[in-house]
Amino acid sequence: MRFVLYNIRYATGTGPAFHLPVPGAGYLRSNTRVLDRITQYLKSLNPDLVGLIEIDTGSIRSGLVNQAKQIADSLGHYSTYECKYGTTSINQMVPIVRKQANAFLAAPRVEGERFHYFETGIKRLIIELELEDVAVFLVHLSLSSATATISSATCTNW
């Protein structure tokens, strides 16, 4: 099985233009060419399973395009995605932010999917994807070492 994990950073691109007109401005706009290049790159790898971190599921930033669905359709894969913040998080109310998610794309037959959430941290989402012979978990751990340690310990107890 070929598994690819890719933090696509909302297909916002990189480089000097990302920081114009102010630092970080690139997070407020997406570029369809970037998403197309990411999609072509993933196609070239011919993956069975793709974990996507930092995708946009249809905010104004992505031109209302669900990036997970668009990539999955291009690959001929099944997709499942969910907002990366807890269901009761204030982030669920904020435009653009409420469309920030993580996703799985899968070529093999999917037996089931579940969404779990850590009890602490900002990025709480855990996606569980059940395939025929294996269950795979997708987690975007915090940069905070204390939160990441707690989250990692939670994962190892499953």
Region locations from a protein language model:
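N-terminal, active-site-proximal structural segment of metallo-dependent hydrolase catalytic domains
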Residues: 1-74, 81-89
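Short, basic/glycine-rich phosphate-binding loops at helix/coil junctions
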Residues: 11-21, 101-104, 133-137
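Short acidic/glycine-rich loop or secondary-structure boundary segments that cap or lie
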Residues: 13-14, 89, 113, 145-147
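Short secondary-structure boundary/capping elements
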Residues: 30-34, 121, 147
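A generic local structural motif
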Residues: 36-38, 91, 125, 153-155
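Structured beta-strand-rich core segments of catalytic domains in phosphoester-bond hydrolases
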Residues: 54-133
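Active-site beta-loop-alpha substructure in enzyme catalytic cores
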Residues: 134-158
